[in-house]
């Protein structure tokens, strides 16, 4: 530890102690909050099923930065490089299309064995795994419908895919000793004016009930469902709306997924957390950055990211909220994208843990809104960066932008050689 860092750390401890904050306790709490990194940033949501296939489902990864991962080995190597530069506990979030098999596997036939390499890798790297059925980029999703499809056979295919995915998820949890959160998102919807909005939702309701009918150990597997406002090609009607999934998660007591980009541009999920927690047992968060639509830009340390973190910490939701990331930017170095976004999420959590929440609550309850605003703003100037740098030091990761040198070296030595 450098003398400069030691001095900054000691000063930070004193400054935060003056407002009633124990920085050591804050760092201990931060180590209780893993962030689930999404594998699909590494290859632009391509997966390993069909290298020539295109991304569908009303989502887009824009850009053509060189060096994207082309197979599981490259993707795991890239993830390891990113994770070395991110302090503290992490998880990995996988989609079903990232299976590994020597022969083609139909999505309704995926099995735990197709993900055993991921599990062994997770064990070696002390990671938990999360999972998602992939209800997009497939011939049977080409018309824009999956679990709500009017064709019984197509709908059953997707039901069977989700049921098979739940078994994979439970396998993750059993093998790794930490529950896998499996999130169901479907792209189902219509481009233009929709006459019958009820029937697809009735079919989706019945399909989801069949999907979750098999009882699985909650210590191994957690079901989550995710809404969306619209997607490309589904601008006028989305079957799985916020109201649909809020009702479903409440009535079935599944987890509810809130994606930062899946609502109207003037809505924020930070305001939805406390409301949803009154009705659902657990929340899954997909922290993202929507720019005018669900563009999935890299997460910044901005007001909304901070507000999300603050909601988790202020209400002590550590055991009820699962923090995941969801962005995919193909216009910049993909490893850097992971590092920037994940470090920013962790910085926001740390800043929330360094807030004198008890004092702010007292001021609010007393109606002293002047002091509340003053303290909230003064808090931003306290030396949280020194605490962050100590956290990085203790986890043997770069504290500042030094991590970028490692990414550039990896790009030169590894990524530049990929076709």
UniProtKB/Swiss-Prot annotation:
Pathway: Carbohydrate degradation; L-rhamnose degradation; glycerone phosphate from L-rhamnose: step 1/3. This is L-rhamnose isomerase. The keyword Metal-binding applies. It is an enzyme of class 5 (isomerase). Its main location: cytoplasm. Keywords: Cytoplasm, Isomerase, Manganese, Metal-binding, Rhamnose metabolism. Mn(2+) binds at residues 262, 294, 296. Homotetramer. It is found in: Cytoplasm. Its EC number is 5.3.1.14. It comes from the Bacteria. Its cofactor is Mn(2+).
């Amino acid at each position: 530890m450098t003398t400069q860092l030691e001095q900054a750390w000691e000063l930070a401890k004193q400054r935060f102690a003056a407002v009633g904050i124990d920085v050591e306790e804050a760092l201990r709490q931060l180590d209780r909050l893993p962030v689930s990194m999404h594998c699909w940033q590494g290859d632009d949501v391509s997966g390993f099923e069909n290298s020539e296939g295109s991304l569908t489902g009303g989502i887009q990864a824009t850009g053509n930065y060189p060096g994207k991962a082309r197979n599981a080995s490259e993707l795991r190597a890239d993830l390891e490089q990113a994770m070395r530069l991110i302090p503290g506990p992490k998880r990995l979030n996988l989609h079903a299309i990232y299976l590994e098999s020597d022969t083609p596997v139909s999505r309704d036939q995926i099995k735990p064995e197709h993900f055993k390499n991921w599990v062994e890798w997770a064990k070696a790297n002390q990671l938990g795994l999360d999972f998602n059925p992939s209800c997009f980029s497939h011939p049977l999703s080409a018309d824009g419908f999956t679990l709500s499809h009017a064709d019984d056979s197509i709908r059953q295919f997707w039901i069977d895919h989700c049921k098979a995915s739940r078994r994979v998820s439970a396998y993750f949890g059993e093998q790794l000793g930490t529950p896998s959160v499996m999130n169901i998102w479907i792209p189902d919807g219509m481009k233009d004016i929709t006459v019958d909005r009820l029937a697809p939702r009735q079919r989706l309701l019945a399909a989801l009930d069949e999907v979750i009918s098999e009882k699985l150990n909650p210590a191994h597997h957690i079901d989550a469902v995710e809404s969306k406002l619209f997607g490309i090609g589904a601008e006028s009607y989305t079957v799985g709306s916020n109201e649909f999934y809020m009702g479903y998660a409440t009535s079935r007591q599944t987890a509810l997924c809130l994606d930062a980009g899946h609502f109207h541009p003037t809505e924020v999920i930070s305001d939805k957390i406390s409301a949803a927690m009154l009705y659902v047992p657990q929340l899954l968060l997909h922290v993202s950055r929507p720019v005018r639509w669900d563009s999935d830009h890299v997460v910044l340390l901005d007001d909304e990211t901070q507000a999300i973190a603050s909601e988790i910490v202020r209400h002590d939701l550590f055991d009820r909220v699962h923090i995941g990331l969801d962005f995919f930017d193909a216009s910049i170095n993909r490893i850097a994208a992971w590092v920037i976004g994940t470090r920013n999420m962790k910085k926001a959590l740390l800043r929330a843990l360094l807030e004198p929440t008890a004092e702010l609550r007292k001021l609010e309850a007393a109606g002293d809104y002047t002091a509340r605003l003053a303290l909230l703003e003064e808090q931003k100037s306290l030396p949280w960066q020194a605490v962050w740098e100590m956290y990085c030091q203790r986890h043997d990761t770069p504290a500042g932008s030094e991590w970028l040198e490692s990414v550039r070296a990896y790009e030169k030595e590894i990524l530049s050689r990929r076709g």
